Amino acid sequence: YQKVSLSEDAKKYNWYSIENEAERKTLETPFYTVVFDENGMIARLYDKKNDREVLKPDQKGNRMVMYEDKPMCFDNWDIDMYYTEKGWEVSNLSRFEWTDLGPLCVSIELERTISNSLIRQTITFYADSAVIRFDTYVDWKEHQHLLKVHFPVDLHTDEATFDIQFGNLTRKIHQNTSWDEARFESCGQKWMDMSEGHYGVSLLNDCKYGHSAIDGVMTL
């Protein structure tokens, strides 16, 4: 924890701007231009410092999908590669609210439902950091269904790196061979990363360990 004291001038300083429209909401920070669509998904994430789009064209970030999960065996610990054939996008947004509009950060609170389950999420952007924080609470009440969040990043690379207990592991993100096709899921302790040259995107977490990066779509 860190205690930060702010002067009165700092408290009055607006380092962000918000534009609310019927079908989209736009947030401007020193690091990003962020556009949320009517379902609360990230329709655009523009990196100002590096002058580039983070997400693939016409694709959404923070996109949640519920997939049918009926593996051939090991029902509790196994995921079969065909699970993506039957999925439902979590698009039923019941709440979108700007909160914590202060000198240090701006937060958005989202609430979604799908079937019998509830998903609450707080997304935080900072005045002095390029980190985007997602605090996600899921009250999951489904049988033989799993939930994944997707971030389709616009990077020119054929591999992703995953944190493991004794270092890290690099795997291909294509399915050109049967061996690559079988590696549709990767374990990761605390992070995964996709990079090209001097630019990359990392997905960090503190409680989930199943990752995927097929065709450049980072999922958790």
Positions of predicted regions on the chain:
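C-terminal (or distal) subdomains of carbohydrate-active enzymes
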Residues: 1-220
